[in-house]
Amino acid sequence: MKICRYKNPHLKGLPPRLGVIYNGQIIDPHLNFVAEYEREGLFNPWERAEVKCPSSLSKILSLYEKPFETIEEGFAIALFNEKIGELETTQGVPLFYPLDSDTSPITSPLDSIHSFRDFFCYEGHAKKAFKGSIPKEWYQGPTYFRQSHQNFIGHKDTIFWPSLTKKLDFEAELGVVIGLEGRNIKEHNAKNHIFGFTIINDISARDIQKKEWP
């Protein structure tokens, strides 16, 4: 399942929302719960849907030990709504949006990031960096940089070039999103704490970096 956040053109003034990418479109799980509750005639369908499946991915991760179950339920409701031709709420808000559209653009995947660690490199990369001789300390624990968790931007957003650098570089990296909190996690239990994976462009000022870390 591919999860994203997107800007909803019909809910202006509200933050980007949780979406599921499927079959060339963005499905909004929260809105599909709204449509389901409206169909059932339940009171306060929008509020009920926000409790069941929040429009914020970070909120879902903080509330549920198994967040995928809630998202998958909303996805299943969306497929049913599409099958019966129910494509919007009673207020006229669509349940489905075109992918890669200027009207409903994808943003950064998480709305609230509490901690970001940029790990040094893979073993193969480390061998090249240390010219074949990796220090034993490298194997004793993960080596990482403490990065700012407030400087994430989204798909197709503009990367601003700081005036202090003349050598701005980027690296495509694998991002691991932690869903379930923990401490002193054993290797065989690690996957239970991983919510998903994403692709990150790590932007570096190489000339500044060289001065700070020769």
Locate predicted features.
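Glycine-enriched loop-and-adjacent helix/strand subsegments that border the catalytic/binding cleft
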Residues: 105-214
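N-terminal non-catalytic cap/leader segment that marks the start of a structured domain
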Residues: 1-142
